[in-house]
Amino acid sequence: MVQLFDFLQQYSDYFIIGLLLLMSIIMLAMVIERYLFLRKVSVAHYSTIHALDIDLNRNMTVISTIGANAPYVGLLGTVIGILLTFYQIGHGGGDIDPSVIMLHLSLALKATALGILVAIPSMVFYNGLGRKVEVNRLKWKVLSEQKDKE
């Protein structure tokens, strides 16, 4: 058990922060791809709204999933940090310095803050892109109604 705590103490921050960094890079790549696609898509080239929906909504789930799960990844880092703090308190003998405990707990909370920092832009981008998807769907419906009237 001691080896597990030593491993967590050495590598948990790297793992959690690395995972959040990876999530943010993936999210940004998907946002850029979606933005560029939605900016140039021509709804007139689609014969059905279902085909349009498939193209409009591609990668949107990834952006939403990252936004929804990043706080949980950060929370996992915080829980591990608090667990390690309690482990160190338990193995510290009888001397417990409150300032050291507070320092460790505050450092443990950085993972949650980073998770929220990834989640907020993800959800903002998701909602903004979702609006562009809806506008393109409405454009297709208007064109479809105009074709039906002709």
From Swiss-Prot:
The annotated consequence of I25V reads: In strain: TN106
Q: Any keyword Thylakoid?
A: no
One CC-aspect GO term: plasma membrane
Q: What is this protein called?
A: Biopolymer transport protein ExbB
Q: Any idea what job this protein has?
A: Involved in the TonB-dependent energy-dependent transport of various receptor-bound substrates. Protects ExbD from proteolytic degradation and functionally stabilizes TonB.
Task: Keyword check for Cell inner membrane, yes or no.
Answer: yes
Q: What is the effect of changing V100E?
A: In strain: TN106
Gene Ontology biological process terms, A to Z:
protein import; transmembrane transport
Which organism does this record belong to? Haemophilus influenzae (strain ATCC 51907 / DSM 11121 / KW20 / Rd)
Q: What is the effect of changing S42N?
A: In strain: TN106
> What's its membrane topology?
Multi-pass membrane protein
